[in-house]
A protein has these predicted regions:
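Residue-level signature of catalytic and energy-coupling elements of molecular machines
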Residues: 1, 15, 45, 56, ...
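Conserved C-terminal "switch" segment of AAA+ ATPases
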Residues: 7-72, 153-158, 186-196
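Signal for well-folded cores of large energy- and translation-related assemblies
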Residues: 20-23, 42, 54-57, 61, ...
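Conserved C-terminal helix/linker of AAA+ ATPases
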Residues: 60-84, 117-125, 191-201
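Conserved catalytic-core segments of large NTP-driven translation/proteostasis enzymes
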Residues: 66, 70-111
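Soluble catalytic regions of large protease machineries
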Residues: 95-100, 107-251
Length: 251
């Protein structure tokens, strides 16, 4: 019992084979698209995939369906992996529209930087007239790209509602800042003077170096925000289309 065995999460191709294996014993509708299914799911373990498929089977049986369809799979993935509520909370149209615009901003910037990278996106309405959401990126992106993507939601809302500061973006901004610091530490994106000193595991820095690094990070944050706005302007029709689709679905 003194040995440690490292187990890696399934890859996309692994996940598709695992899902196919578990679905062999279940009745499945032709509407289930295996490629779309593997793109929308996060797969940390085989057990997690099996649980999702079993929950989808239970949902289909409860609705007295002849087999599992894509709607069952999407509903279970939303609930199990992204915390969606079973019953849709009542949220105002304005909140839904801003939430949809925010998530569409992330999605459009992500697709502009890395085509085909978004596997799933949805709104997550919640109590107290709030609406969050997410995009699931199924391809690897660099720290610099992640920073621009994180700022896409804020950029989209502030481009549409000129003069307003987008609400609920603190986590996105924190994510962007951390990505900028990681890129500076690992890739030297802010010059060699900040290389290997700006990650979460950094040792204590001198006061002058800390001031210099913070100034560089803030400047990079502004530059990436400008890039996000530029990408959204170049893809205005796509942004409108995605926003409308999210508003229509609401979840």
């Amino acid at each position: 019992f003194d040995r440690k065995i490292e187990l890696q999460a399934p890859t996309a191709s692994d996940a598709e084979e695992i899902i196919t294996h578990y679905l062999k014993t279940k009745r499945v509708s032709d509407s289930v698209n295996m490629e779309d299914l593997t793109r929308m799911m996060r797969y940390n373990s085989c057990a997690e995939l099996e649980t999702i498929l079993n929950e989808a089977a239970v949902r289909a049986a409860f609705a007295r369906k002849t087999g599992i369809d894509m709607e069952d799979m999407v509903s279970v993935v939303l609930k199990q992996q992204y915390g969606a509520q079973e019953d849709m909370p009542r949220v105002s149209d304005e909140v839904i529209e801003k939430g949809a615009l925010h998530e569409a901003g992330h999605l459009v910037v992500c697709e502009a930087l890395c085509p085909g990278s978004v596997g799933f996106a949805s709104l997550l309405p919640s109590d107290e007239n709030r609406c969050g959401g997410f995009i699931h990126c199924c391809k690897g992106v660099s720290d610099s790209q992640s920073a621009i993507i994180a700022l896409g939601g804020k950029a989209a809302v502030e481009t549409r509602y000129v003069g307003q500061v987008a609400e609920g973006c603190s986590d996105d901004i924190a994510c962007a800042v951390n990505c900028i610091r990681e890129a500076a530490a690992k890739e030297g994106t802010l010059g060699f003077s900040l290389l290997n000193v700006e990650s979460d595991s950094s040792s204590n820095m001198s006061e002058s170096l800390n001031a210099r690094s913070e100034a560089a990070v803030q400047a990079e944050l502004e530059r990436y925000y400008g890039k996000a706005r530029a990408l959204l302007a170049q893809n205005e029709a796509f942004l409108k289309e995605i926003t409308e689709a999210l508003v229509m679905k609401k979840t």
